[in-house]
Structures are given as structure tokens and as C-alpha cells.
Design a protein with these regions (language model features):
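N-terminal small-residue-enriched
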Residues: 1-208
Length: 208
């Protein structure tokens, strides 16, 4: 959800065109106070890391959301002037055959203060989505739908029966604002992100 429904909406490719739910939101509250998120292209040997982006700008750790406040977009040189926003070292492309655009590198929520067990015990009724599958996102609205490949019901603070065929439907901006607990168990996944500038390696991570 972070990668697809939230941070794609922070890429200048969408923001500069006014096609993002996060347009004109810098310095504003876009998430719960406990939410902190970064895009860090400097992590040593990480799958999505780069020394410099494809415009020659050094990579950096960009703080996207700090204590719920939107701090930065992901911005390439071309869109920097349009948006009056600093360049963030986020211009990427698969190869010389593609035009560069603003893209993610290693994107993740920072750890919170709650344990996995504390989060489960505090949930009277809910869904533990252990593994997500395919879906779709509208970056202009933040609305998404994702298949739950592996999921379980949470009932009275306990994980109970498995769930088959579940789909999560919602809005990235609403999800961010309603996060009330974040785990201390950050876990990252590796993949290839496709866009108009081709496929590039990225990492996405989040705690429970």
C-alpha cells in the first residue's frame, strides 16, 4: 500500500501535472502523527540503491513524511523548476532508451513502538493481511484495490481462521490518517517497479 497507493502520488511525474491526491500538501498533515516514511537511495548494497540518479544528482535519504507531516516529494531536475521544489536525486530510467522520470528507490515506513503481539491483542475484530497480491491504484485520487493472498481473521485479540478471496479497497490518504499503531518489526520486499521510464529495482518496507 505504501509504494502503490501513497508514494507514487509523491513522484513529481504526477504532482507537477496536478494528477496526485498529494498536490499542494507540503507542510500539511497527511498521515497519523506516528507515521514516518522515507525514500533512501543511499542504503549500502540495498536492491534499490543508487550512487547518483540518471541526471547525475547524488542519491540521498529523502524524508517524505515526518510525524504525519508531508515533508518532500520525489523530484527530478525537469520538474524542480515547475514545482519550485529542491531536486531529490530521484530521476531514474531503465536504460538510455527511456526518458528519465522521478522514481522511488528504497521506500519504507520507519519502525514504531508497538510489538506485533500488542497490535494483535488490541484488535477486537480485523484482518491480518500477511501477504498482498496484485491490484490497481488511481494516483489522482489515491483509491486502490489489492488482493489478499494470505490473510487471517483477528477476533478478540487473537489470530483465528484463514481468509480466502479477500480484497482490500480504500484510499491511500485515508489509510495514512487512520493508522493508530505501528510495529517495531520493519520488513522489506524486493521488486521491479514499472513506469514510463521503464522498470527499475526498488525496495518497499513497512512494519506491522
Amino acid at each position: 500500500i505504501l509504494h502503490e497507493a501513497c508514494v507514487h502520488g509523491l513522484e513529481a511525474t504526477s504532482v507537477a501535472k496536478g494528477m496526485s491526491v498529494f498536490c499542494n500538501k507540503l507542510g500539511q498533515k497527511v498521515a497519523s502523527d506516528i507515521v514516518n516514511a522515507v525514500d533512501d537511495g543511499t542504503n549500502l548494497n540495498a536492491w534499490g540503491s543508487i550512487n547518483v540518479d540518471d541526471e547525475g544528482t547524488p542519491s540521498k535519504c529523502n524524508v517524505l513524511i515526518e510525524n504525519g507531516i508531508l515533508k518532500s516529494y520525489l523530484v527530478d531536475k525537469r520538474n524542480s523548476k515547475k514545482m519550485n521544489h529542491p531536486i531529490t536525486g530521484s530521476s531514474r530510467r531503465e536504460s538510455y532508451k527511456y526518458q528519465t522520470t522521478s522514481r522511488m528507490t528504497n521506500t519504507y515506513f520507519l519502525n514504531g513502538k508497538s510489538t506485533f503481539d500488542e497490535i494483535i491483542k488490541s484488535t477486537e475484530k480485523g484482518l491480518f493481511a500477511e501477504k498482498m497480491g496484485g491490484g490497481s491504484v488511481n494516483p489522482a485520487t489515491g483509491e486502490f484495490n489489492f488482493a489478499v493472498q494470505v490473510g487471517y481473521m483477528i477476533e478478540n485479540g487473537k489470530i483465528t481462521k484463514p481468509v480466502k478471496g479477500a480484497t482490500l479497497v480504500g484510499s491511500g490518504k485515508d489509510v495514512l490518517l487512520h493508522i493508530d499503531m505501528i510495529g517495531d518489526n520493519l520488513s522489506c520486499g524486493y521488486g521491479m517497479c514499472g513506469s514510463m521510464s521503464g522498470s527499475v529495482p526498488t525496495i518497499v518496507g513497512q512494519p506491522t
